[in-house]
Design a protein with these regions (language model features):
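Active-site segments that bind and position negatively charged phosphate/pyrophosphate groups
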Residues: 363-465
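A glycine/threonine-rich phosphate-anchoring loop and its flanking beta-alpha core
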Residues: 252-333
């Protein structure tokens, strides 16, 4: 909801809505816990009020009577949450609604006037049927999802949710950031602060300069000083609002402040949404290489709000596509990636960021569901090997050994997404030379990146041999050997150890 100036109106409650068995109560409890908010399950309130289960209410009194009880309970819940003050500077509670609560117009108006309604994207029909079948009779109207599809689709704010490793909750949706950020300890990227702070109604207590060149120990020390001046203690939570650099630095500062405080990651670029936001890796760069100082410190909550994509240039959208295509190489062709980019409707052609355009994610060529599906490739691997000790997680490094060397060799003039695209193609060529992939594979792989407007060959004046000394400093080295994650085909990425002091690439 916006006021007449176009500024997001502050919300006082998060209402979760959606089809029966879509996960409203599970998500509500997890979200409230991580935000330190109260949680209300409307169905539980109804059962307590009526003194009988919901199936029993339907059986003995009928649906109309149930809806009356539901409406009364909702009014009581809302009146109990909303303070008798004209304004509130933070979200106060998370409320899980029933699968048909907002069919009544007055209930919908009540929720939209006093909070933000987020409709949970319905799982597949098979998964929905499995969940309903797991507790037969517990959901009297569990078969109404298809019938109500248009009703659920009328809610513009959508969310999907799943867990990363170590109970890190990932929420992907549209329009959820304002409710999460209100009243919190926010660290923001300087560009994001300029474009979004006023619109979100927040005042970041620390600002991080934009750009990989600022991802240094000095920046971490400045954050520690800001944490101290803010008075952050062991029970506090800090929020990172920005791209991958902001998340890495804020997460590392949180990991090391008072031996570890909680943090929430709110990525604002497509690249950080589909890559750095999950997995728990935090850190900073050193003169010898990228991310050499760091820690595994999973955020307790990751909030991916596709509204932030409005301010991205086509170049930054393409940067994010590079990581999505990398995930496709790991998970198999079509794993959460469209075959080609849709036309992009953004304000800038060359710039790094613009004022919010009002375009939704789908108009920008990326959908919320696509981001969630792509992220699941990475999350599935991280769950198996959260601290990179079993070897499985090395697959996520596909293309990155060469990419990091390119970034360092060019003084980070080549963006991370561009470097990943080039690195993936170069490492595909290495796979061919080692007899691990067919000769046609690098060209096919390169075509995928080219379709996303990404470069696929080394920058002028650079050769692979010239990058080898930089690769020897890779953090995944073991003596003189470096483990590459070589792309050998769609769904076929292999960890291969190469001794760069003895072997040619």
């Amino acid at each position: 909801m916006r006021d007449k100036s176009g500024i997001e109106c502050l919300k006082r409650a998060i209402f979760l809505y959606g089809a029966p068995a879509s996960g409203k109560s599970t998500l509500g409890k997890a979200l409230a816990e991580r935000l330190g908010l109260g949680f209300v399950d409307l169905d539980e309130r109804i059962v307590a009020e009526a003194g009988m289960s919901i199936p029993e209410i339907f059986k003995t009194r009928g649906e109309a009577a149930f809806r009356d009880i539901e409406s009364k309970a909702l009014k009581e819940v809302v009146s109990g949450i909303i303070p008798k003050l004209p304004t509130s500077n933070s979200t106060l509670a998370v409320v899980s609604l029933g699968g048909g609560t907002l069919l009544r117009g007055e209930n919908r108006s009540l929720c939209e006037e006093n909070g933000t309604v987020f409709c949970i994207d319905t799982p597949s029909d098979d998964e929905l049927a499995r969940r309903i079948g797991a507790a037969p009779g517990s959901r009297p109207l569990g078969d109404k999802a298809k019938e109500r599809a248009a009703h659920y689709a009328s809610f513009p704010n959508r969310v999907a949710a799943f867990f990363d490793a170590q109970s890190s909750l990932v929420v992907v949706g549209r329009g959820i950031a304002p409710a999460i950020l209100a009243g919190r300890n926010v660290v923001a990227d300087e560009t994001v602060a300029r474009l979004w702070a006023g619109r979100l109604g927040i005042s970041p207590f620390a600002i991080i300069p934009s750009g990989e060149e600022h991802k240094t120990p000095v920046a971490v020390a400045k954050l520690w000083r800001a944490f101290s001046e803010r008075g952050l203690g062991r029970k506090d939570t800090v929020v990172a609002l920005g791209g991958g650099v902001t998340g890495d630095l804020t997460g590392f500062a949180a990991a090391t402040w008072m031996r570890g405080i909680s943090w929430i990651n709110v990525p604002t670029t497509l690249l950080s949404m589909v890559d750095a936001s999950t997995g728990g890796k935090t850190g900073c760069d050193l003169p010898d290489g990228k991310n050499l100082a760091g820690a595994f410190h999973f955020p307790k909550l990751v909030v991916i709000d596709t509204d932030f994509l409005e301010t991205l240039s086509p170049k930054l959208i393409s940067d994010g596509r590079a990581e999505m295509i990398k995930h496709e190489a790991i998970g198999g062709k079509g794993a959460g990636v469209r075959g080609r980019n849709r036309p992009l409707r953004v304000g800038a052609t060359l710039g790094e960021a613009t004022e919010p355009s009002g375009a939704c994610a789908e108009e920008l060529g990326v959908s919320t569901k696509e981001i969630a599906a792509n992220l699941m490739v990475k999350v599935g691997i991280v769950r198996e090997d959260p601290l990179e000790t079993l070897g499985r997680r090395i697959l996520l490094n596909c293309g990155h050994t060469v990419a990091h060397a390119i970034e360092k060799a060019t003084g980070y003039r080549v963006s991370h997404g561009e470097a990943v695209a080039i690195g993936c193609v170069e490492e595909a060529k290495i796979a061919v030379r080692r007899g691990l992939a067919p000769a046609s594979w690098p060209e096919e792989f390169a075509a995928r990146f080219a379709a996303a407007n990404l470069p696929t060959s080394l920058p002028g004046g650079l050769s692979l041999d010239e990058l080898v000394p930089l690769m020897r400093g890779d953090k995944k080295r073991d003596g003189g050997a470096v483990t590459f994650a070589l792309p050998c085909g769609w769904g076929d990425v292999r960890g291969v150890k190469i001794d760069l002091s003895k072997e040619s690439l």
